[in-house]
């Protein structure tokens, strides 16, 4: 297949090609011209490049991507999505793993900034930790797409920001949790990384909802930096400090952490007394909601954010002018009614 060739992915190789996990291969190519036209780019150029190849954006493009760390399933899903859409649309994606570490990601982005790209897309592990190399790339005329979290609190010339409403996500999933425990009891919040704007928003949403439930008491709120091993250690300590009957609920800033805590709680034989919720609606968490081991999760649409970054970055690299500075990418609270459909959309790299 053309996706394995060195000369780039061509739309003609994918038009009409359908398989179980990739019905989008034909549809994605067919829709790019309308995206380009809507953003003021030349739709005819999208169909045929200067060499006669039918690349989605007139020529093969090279992009660099980085998110917080592939140890998080949300980030791993995003990587798979960006690479898959890149193959469909003729964008060669090079990945720089953030390693769930400010220092690791900074070194990766410093290296990224030494090279030339058609566009880059970044989810920062911590706010204001990548400003200098990102400004260096912007100064070279490279469009920078910001994904999910804020790179800089100042305006440094980011092309656009694809972001979910983290406050809303934290609020709605916390409300579902408190309803599950009847509006009363003790809760623990396990945070992500304190410098991560997504985690900050989810914490704010949690506290907004907590204020509406006077009979719910917050026992502890500690960061685990998205690290499931830190989560396990924290919750082992909580279960010792707060004996049976003293914890009714746990809210986690992502699903990986919620599921890690669920294992610790189950090993202690306390799974029936503590309700848990997470954020991201990754497939294992959606299944956990369906089987009752999680009380809820809310979708942070990793696939939509990452394929959006591929498409919008390519638009910016090929002359689109009216790209908005902010694009909201919200997802729903997961219920039994929508779970199967959401899983299907994730499997197709859409949601």
Regions found by a protein language model. Name each.
Residues 124-139, 206, 220, 224-287:
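Hydrophobic alpha-helical
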Residues 74-88, 169-173, 197-216, 230, ...:
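Short, solvent-exposed amphipathic alpha-helices that sit
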Residues 128-168, 179, 186, 192, ...:
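Flexible loop/hinge segments that line or gate small-molecule binding clefts
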Residues 1-18, 29-38:
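N-terminal secretory signal peptides
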Residues 40-47:
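Bacterial lipoprotein signal-peptidase II cleavage site
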Residues 49-61, 190, 194-198, 209, ...:
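Hinge/cleft segment of the Venus flytrap/periplasmic-binding protein
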Residues 57, 105, 161-187, 200-201, ...:
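Hydrophobic alpha-helical segments within soluble ligand-binding/sensing domains
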């Amino acid at each position: 297949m053309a996706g394995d060739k060195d000369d780039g992915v061509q739309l003609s190789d994918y038009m009409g090609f359908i398989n179980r996990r990739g019905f989008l291969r034909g549809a994605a190519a067919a829709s790019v011209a309308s995206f380009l036209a809507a953003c003021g780019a030349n739709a005819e150029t999208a169909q045929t490049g200067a060499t006669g190849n039918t690349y989605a954006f007139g020529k093969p493009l090279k992009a660099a991507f980085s998110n917080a760390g592939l140890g998080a399933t949300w980030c791993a899903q995003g990587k798979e999505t960006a690479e898959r859409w890149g193959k469909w649309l003729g964008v060669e994606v090079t990945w720089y793993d953030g390693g769930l570490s400010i220092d690791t990601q900074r070194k990766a982005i410093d290296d990224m900034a030494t090279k030339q790209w058609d566009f880059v897309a970044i989810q920062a592990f911590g706010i204001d930790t990548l400003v200098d190399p990102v400004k260096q790339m912007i100064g070279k005329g490279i469009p920078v797409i910001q994904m999910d979290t804020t790179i800089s609190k100042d305006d440094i010339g980011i092309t656009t920001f694809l972001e979910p409403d983290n406050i809303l996500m934290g609020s709605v999933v916390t409300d579902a949790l408190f309803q599950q425990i009847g509006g009363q009891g003790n809760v623990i919040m396990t945070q992500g990384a304190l410098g991560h704007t997504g985690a900050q928003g989810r914490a704010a949403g949690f506290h907004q909802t907590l204020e509406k439930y006077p009979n719910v008491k917050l026992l502890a709120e500690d960061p685990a930096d998205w690290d499931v091993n830190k989560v396990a250690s924290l919750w082992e300590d909580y279960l010792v400090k707060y004996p049976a009957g003293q914890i009714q609920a746990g809210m986690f800033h992502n699903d990986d952490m919620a599921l890690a805590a669920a294992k610790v709680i189950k090993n202690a034989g306390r799974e029936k007394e503590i309700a848990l919720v997470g954020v991201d609606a990754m497939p294992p968490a959606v299944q956990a909601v369906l089987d009752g081991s999680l009380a809820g999760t809310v979708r942070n649409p990793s696939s939509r954010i990452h394929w959006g970054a591929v498409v919008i970055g390519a638009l910016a690299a090929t002359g689109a002018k009216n790209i908005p500075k902010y694009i909201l990418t919200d997802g729903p609270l997961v219920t039994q009614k929508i779970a199967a459909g959401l899983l299907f959309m994730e499997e197709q790299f859409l949601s």
